[in-house]
């Protein structure tokens, strides 16, 4: 996916335009110093050079393919706005950078499955409690629920908390309440995965849309086998992930603690 031909071309284009922006800003400044001919103002030269540096950096950063279509839309609009009024072009470019940064998908140092349950999402632990499974899942057992809230600045690619087979996938349409609130687990749009690990335990993972997030993306299908830390989905622009574990598990995190998807141990 990341090394496909279209992705390689897009990364090379980002690198090319990044270097082009840096060169344009530097050459414009040099011409102004040597000849007195002002092609851009000092602020514009600095802005163009900064845009180049950031664009070049993004060509090196791993970005989820879902973000590239947003990049193309924003960069075209930014170019059009900048043609008519430079400050608007800079603003549009900054929004473009934020969109690409939002869809970043860095590699993670994934621990072995014997160490425990890893966090499915980047963010902050917002709930730890004993409760029942989501009503859409047929289970009457008391479970340990650990919730991770993701704000718009977190990485939003979700990863499998355990290795296992997908027994059930349930999509539930709903509202878009602030995902940090308890009622979001019951009322918001969500996607439920039921995994069975090598101990025949059921691990339930729920992706929940938030106040800004309007779409949950799933990369997996029923009966797929997932490795621990494997990417299974993404939620756009602020959201939450709930994990339901057998009650025998002990939480290894506390409320308010920051966690990293694919790396942080949340229970064992």
Residue ranges and their predicted role:
Residues 2-268:
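Contiguous, well-folded functional domains in the mature portion of proteins
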